[in-house]
Amino acid sequence: MTKLAAAALALCVATPALAAKVAGVEFPDSVDVGGKTLKLNGAGLRKKFIVKVYAGGLYVVEPSRDAAAIVAADAPKRVRMVFLRSVARSQVLDAYRDGFEKNSPGPGLTGLVAKLDRIAPAIPAELKEGAEMLVTYVPGEGTTVVATGGGSATVEGKEFADALFKNWLGAHPADEDLKAGMLGR
């Protein structure tokens, strides 16, 4: 392999997704969060068995393919979900609880699960097809959840943000293919 070809390949591997379209859902290459520009790290499709549940995109300050580094960074980040089918709030919260148990076990688990009750009012009883949900972490403010047809709720602290973002990026994500997409792989 020539040096030029090797350099071009390295650049392609190191360059994050600039914009994406997943299952007909467009993800812009950047979004503004609290005066900071977050870049699209990657996007993918959440499936449950063979059913398409939502298209999801991950936005971060500094794009990376390192899931642990993204979760650990005390920097703004966002996951945008656009639902491709109707999903009940209880299903969303159950999925988050399951993710907490798999990715954040230990003595703090009970407190993390209890904090889910604080975001529940932001999620409507049913997220209809086409509904959007944003999960945004901002240092010093916490994690804010906003959903179409719902409200807005914020949970303070980075620990909750880490646990929630591990649902997509942890060692045991809800969907490996979605994780790979969000990491631009």
Where are these regions (language model features)?
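Positively charged n-region of N-terminal signal peptides that target proteins for export
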Residues: M1-L4
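Sec/Tat signal peptide C-region and signal peptidase I cleavage site
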Residues: T15-A19
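N-terminal structural module
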Residues: A20-A72
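Mid-length scaffold segments of soluble, non-membrane domains
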Residues: S64-G140
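Flexible glycine-rich active-site/ligand-binding loops centered on an Asp-His dyad
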Residues: S152-L178
